[in-house]
Amino acid sequence: MAWDDDLDPASVAYAIAVDDSRFIRVVAGPGTGKSFALKRRVARLLEGGVPADRLLPVTFTRVAAEDLQRELINMGVPGCDQLRGSTLHSLGMQILSRQHVLAVTGRVSRVLNRFELEPLLYDLPPSFGNKRSREKRIRAYEAAWARLQHEEPGFDLTAQDQAFEHRLISWLRFHRGMLIGEIIPELYRYLRNNPAAPEVSTYDYLLVDEYQDLNKAEQTVIDLLGSHAAVCIVGDDDQSLYSFKYAHPAGIRVFHRTHANVSDHQY
């Protein structure tokens, strides 16, 4: 089955699939077919000879990545069996576990198990408050990085916050572990501080589904991974289900202002 089988050349999905712009934004509500258009775009690129390892579909869940590959296989798209769609967290753990990256970051990307959090909380000194206060401090530390508050003008940590971060990171380094909320920030810092890193030029095409559900750090990681790539983002600017995970729906609304010559498609 060719990528354009049963696809109306006048349809939005067709226009998205053939768009050769460097930056593409697709805004559509739920159930309008935006993920279908993304699938056809991936199929068109693979059929056009783009190597599967130069193309990165980013999905919000692992199940969505598996669904995309299964549908492409059912279409008989050449090379789709080599395609590796991924969530950003999964990709982040893969990158951070590479030896050359570990040598730079000094952080082991082994996410702490839940039972390991108890000794962490116990080992943090009482000067940071009771157990509940220490838990809140850890959440605030993760939230600040998810929102990239450290990058905002005027943001300044108190002396106690700085001391807390130092003790927290020292503990994590010693125990060769990482908080789940540190994966993306560590990936962000690595990519930002190492613009010549091989990961920055790994992909020629990035395709990102449910962009509005990514937090600010995740959206910035997409920019860094796509420094030399064509980037297509897909999402609904009116619906974000993950505000409790610090989703940044404003990112899709202002994408045309933060990126040059954006090609817009709307359902």
Task: Show the residue positions of the predicted features.
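Conserved RecA-like helicase ATPase core segment
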Residues: Q219-Y267
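Conserved ATP-dependent motor core of P-loop NTPases, especially the RecA-like helicase ATPase domain
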Residues: D19-S21, L88, R107-P119, R134-A140
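Short, well-ordered alpha-helices that flank and scaffold nucleotide-derived cofactor binding pockets
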Residues: R40-E47, R70-N74, P185, R189-R192, ...
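Accessory N-terminal region flanking or inserted into the helicase ATPase core
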Residues: M1-T32, F36-A37, R54-L56, D123-L207, ...
